[in-house]
């Protein structure tokens, strides 16, 4: 029948519809609930509006709000409502771009005379957005010629810039070369690739979060725009839960806790992204490093050390100056050894070239492989000031860097044992909810043949598949020198952090021309595996601080026990008990009774100490103490020897 079309559904079934039927019509034939919930459709792999006429034979799935694609669309459409509200309320304002992002959306604006948005402005904007939503304005898609688009957006220079580059800009261009727009009648139109919800009435569970400065196209030479961030969800309950998570995340912010708990700071005199660790933070970091060193020694790693700078030739050979120069600090030009022209030195951005030179320093035999090198190596990355963020994005960091040199035959076993080692060690620090991500060859920045990349990628895939964890594919996300598997860890409030990485590298061994002598007496190229377990000490410190909300487990806490006397005449015993605990290997202190006991206990709790011991007359007589555990019930008259045994067990078991 010529007037019918056949549509394939995700479950393999088929629907017959009248020719010209839309995705919305299809949803209605499946059921009234789906028709009500439908946001967009995926037609032959491409996202489309519900008004899209379906072609005969198409494979179609209907997208609902609770899915990732549905939420993405809701946030995208809400960004358009934000732009309309701002242009309504601020005459002379111009708008730039407004994409959906993880958990929300933003839109960039430029206000007349360099004005900025205020908190009161956000309230007004949000109120206007709710009016637009109540009007149920449709999202109407169109495609227009470039000259018409330029005339339509003549008062908005950033839109005109996008239009002029439409052929290369997926935010505006279509397959036909026309400029794609979406209109919300009667007064708003925007450049956009879409798709969008059917009308603004499908939105509403949103809030505007904050305003920040943002350079146009992320370029520091371009104008600074005003970026309004918001979040949008499919239900009121989901929005409320997200805002609660944000509140909890704010309480756990490592920058805030770092100051409150006297862990670290970023002095202006040193520079952006360069941290100093205070004694308490230094204690936590030392414990992290010491335990890691011990585990690496048990696993057969050999410890190496390398300098912080090198002549440029090393990074030319490694490819860093070709592929990573934007992330490196500028060179230091030195007249080395009296040479007239001098030599450029660079702060090292990575440790791997130095470890390769150690391998290459002498002839290697197959009997030495696998050779596992490990270093807590300081590296330096020139991060833009706009992306520097606490300890999670710094310019100077220490990586727990390992490089394994092995034969091709050993590679599979090494990757398997490496991944087991990584997951076990992260578990000892209290992270045990993981998934894995496999990052493949980047399209533009890559060295080596496609065949070599495929071989390395498959080796990583095989190792990851042996673990009982979800494996997510990150197409094109590999480093320029090889693919990687990264361990993604979820913290106590469900956020995901990229932790350890494992990379197979066929390229650097070739660039440095390293070899080993095989069983046949011939020279062979080793496989090189890069592995950073923490990523960097600084970033891992931040993750643990937020995971534990500053309340580090007893084995990591900078102070494990504080001893308090009930009265000032108990102070001598309190300090003597603290000294006994120190002698037993614990981190303990005591505080004089110069204020009421309740105030001293409260202050100790704000420092998030695992244990507070209180001693009075009976405790002095019986060698006992009142034990006040963090988050637990107070126990009175506990024998000090029993407490020592308990604390020792917690430390031994990493609790």
What is each stretch, according to the model?
Residues 1-76, 81-94, 102-104, 108-655:
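NTP/phosphate- and nucleic-acid-binding module
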């Amino acid at each position: 029948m010529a007037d019918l079309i056949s549509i394939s559904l995700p479950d393999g079934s088929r629907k017959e519809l009248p020719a010209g039927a839309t995705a919305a019509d299809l949803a209605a034939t499946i059921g009234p609930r789906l028709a009500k919930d439908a946001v967009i459709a995926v037609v032959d792999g491409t996202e489309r509006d519900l008004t899209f006429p379906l072609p005969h034979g198409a494979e179609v799935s209907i997208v609902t709000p609770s899915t990732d694609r549905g939420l993405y669309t809701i946030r995208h459409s809400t960004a358009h409502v934000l732009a309309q509200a701002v242009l309504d309320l601020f005459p002379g304002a111009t708008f730039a771009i407004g994409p959906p992002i993880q958990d929300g959306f933003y839109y960039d604006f430029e206000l007349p005379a360099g004005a900025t948005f205020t908190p009161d402005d956000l309230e007004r904007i949000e109120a206007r957005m709710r009016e637009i939503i109540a009007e149920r304005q449709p999202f109407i898609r169109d495609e227009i010629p470039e000259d018409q688009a330029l005339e339509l957006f003549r008062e908005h220079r950033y839109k005109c810039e996008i239009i002029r580059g439409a052929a290369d800009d997926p935010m505006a261009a279509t397959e036909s070369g026309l400029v794609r727009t979406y209109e919300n009648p009667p007064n708003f139109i925007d450049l956009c690739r879409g798709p969008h919800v059917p009308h603004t009435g499908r939105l509403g569970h949103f809030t505007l979060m904050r305003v920040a400065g943002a350079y146009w196209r992320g370029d520091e030479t371009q104008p600074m725009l005003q970026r309004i961030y918001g979040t949008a969800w499919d239900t009121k309950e989901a929005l409320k839960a997200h805002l609660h998570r944000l509140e909890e995340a704010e309480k756990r912010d490592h920058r805030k806790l770092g100051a409150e708990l006297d862990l670290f700071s970023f002095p202006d005199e040193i520079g952006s992204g360069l941290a100093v660790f205070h004694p308490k933070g230094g204690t936590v970091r030392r414990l992290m490093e010491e335990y890691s060193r011990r585990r690496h020694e048990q696993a057969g790693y050999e410890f190496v050390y390398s300098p912080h700078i090198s002549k440029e030739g090393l990074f030319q050979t490694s490819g860093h100056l070709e592929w990573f120069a934007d992330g490196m600090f500028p060179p230091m030009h030195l007249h080395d050894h009296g040479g007239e022209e001098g030599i450029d030195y660079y702060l090292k951005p990575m440790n791997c070239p130095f470890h390769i030179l150690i391998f290459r320093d002498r002839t290697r035999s197959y009997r030495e492989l696998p050779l596992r090198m490990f270093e807590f190596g300081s590296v330096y990355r020139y991060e833009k000031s706009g992306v520097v963020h606490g300890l999670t994005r710094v310019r100077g960091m220490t990586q727990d860097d390992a490089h394994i040199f092995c034969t091709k035959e050993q590679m599979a076993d090494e990757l398997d044992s490496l991944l087991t080692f990584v997951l076990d060690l992260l578990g000892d620090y209290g992270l045990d909810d993981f998934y894995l991500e496999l990052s493949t060859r980047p399209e533009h920045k890559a060295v080596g043949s496609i065949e070599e990349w495929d071989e390395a990628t498959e080796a990583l895939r095989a190792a990851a598949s042996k673990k009982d964890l979800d494996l997510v594919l990150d197409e094109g996300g590999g480093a320029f020198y090889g693919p990687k598997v990264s361990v993604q860890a979820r913290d106590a409030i469900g956020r995901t952090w990229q932790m350890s990485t494992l990379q197979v590298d066929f390229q650097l061994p070739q660039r440095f021309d390293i070899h080993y002598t095989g069983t046949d007496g011939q020279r062979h190229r080793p496989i090189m595996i890069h592995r950073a377990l923490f990523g960097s000490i600084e970033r891992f410190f931040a993750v643990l601080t937020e995971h534990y909300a500053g309340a580090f487990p007893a084995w990591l806490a900078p102070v494990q026990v504080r001893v308090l006397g009930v009265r000032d005449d108990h102070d001598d015993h309190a300090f003597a008990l603290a000294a006994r605990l120190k002698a037993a290997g614990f981190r303990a202190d005591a505080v004089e009774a110069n204020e009421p006991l309740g105030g001293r206990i409260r202050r100790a709790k704000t420092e998030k100490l695992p244990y507070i011991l209180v001693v009075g007359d009976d405790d002095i007589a019986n060698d006992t103490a009142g034990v006040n555990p963090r988050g637990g019930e107070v126990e009175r008259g506990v024998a000090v020897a029993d407490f020592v045994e308990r604390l020792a067990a917690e430390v031994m078991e990493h609790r």
